Amino acid sequence: MAKEKFDRSKTHANIGTIGHVDHGKTTLTAAIATVLSKKLGGEARSYDQIDNAPEEKERGITINTSHIEYETEKRHYAHVDCPGHADYVKNMITGAAQMDGGILVVSAADGPMPQTREHILLSRNVGVPALVVFLNKVDMVDDEELLELVEMEVRDLLSEYDFPGDDVPVIAGSALKALEGVEEYEDKIMELMDAVDEYIPTPERDSDKPFMMPVEDVFSITGRGTVATGRVERGQVKVGEEVEIIGLTEEPSKTTVTGVEMFRKLLDYAEAGDNIGALLRGVSREDVQRGQVLAKPGSITPHTKFKAEVYVLSKEEGGRHTPFFTNYRPQFYFRTTDVTGVVNLPEGTEMVMPGDNIEMNVELISPIAIEDGTRFSIREGGRTVGSGVVSVIEK
């Protein structure tokens, strides 16, 4: 039987449940899918189906993640849920599951716990744009004042990490009771999803963002000029438009795209996802190299110093067997190339062990086109030993 057609008329967003262990993330995920399927049609998912998350490999890192899909009246969602805390850390840093927004689950019976804090910090550092809060297990709390106290604590915690704590929607309910079909709690799930629909911004499509293409290879074609090839990461470029060549040199240089070719056919323009060759006017083969990017002028700039949130692979994942210290000098692999950089650990951190995650300062020996949210791998001799995302650009 043919699968039903994917409905493109609804906007699509990627979200995930985050929060402390045993506060009810997976139960809530099951409750959302179940209640929405009951009210609006679609596939219900049981707790067990979600909890037995398959192992995935992303950049050589083993991550257990469950992906489910569901729809509200307004949107189509892909929802990611992870069984273990380490899986969240890896997922968010590698971008294995890009999140346009998150549902922070906090048990009303326990209040915010250490991983609640850590997941909020991670969300901020990896650039999750918005969070909505679900206060779970309210059926276990008799005291109305206690609920208000927990809500205040969560709001303060969000504000501490630069989320708008006063404005974030907080919905109180019970995922378990909703799964059991208790109507007042099913209504709370619908209320939560209304908040997610309204409060989590519609993600900007890659094709609407400013043009950027990482350069993978460079050819010179006799009589025509220099061609840079690569996959357009975002935006679009039209023949005749000006672009900048950015990275690995002190200053970006400007050129004009005089031709766009894909599968040996000439195009008027290329957009996100296309593998193309871009013919560049007045550029010699020496002026452009792998590791640079072509980009809309002024949209991205080259930098050497930044803060990053990093996950260090464990020995079992093929990572290092020993810790590293400040002044560690590995290669940082951005898009298509390795650049050596020097690591500076935060004050009070003596060393970083395999399997840890850490916020560190990095200084590259050559400038690379980066911005907040740019992802990279850390490598030693071609072997991946870490994965990271730029959280703050410093220079």
From Swiss-Prot:
Its main location: cytoplasm. Mg(2+) binds at residue 26. Residues 60-64 are annotated as: G2. One of its GO terms (cellular component) is cytosol. This is Elongation factor Tu. Monomer. The lineage of its organism: Bacteria, Bacillati, Bacillota, Bacilli, Bacillales. Residues 10-204 form the tr-type G domain. GTP binds at residues 19-26, 81-85, 136-139. It comes from Macrococcus caseolyticus (strain JCSC5402). It is found in: Cytoplasm. GTP hydrolase that promotes the GTP-dependent binding of aminoacyl-tRNA to the A-site of ribosomes during protein biosynthesis. Residues 81-84 are annotated as: G3. Belongs to the TRAFAC class translation factor GTPase superfamily. Classic translation factor GTPase family. EF-Tu/EF-1A subfamily.
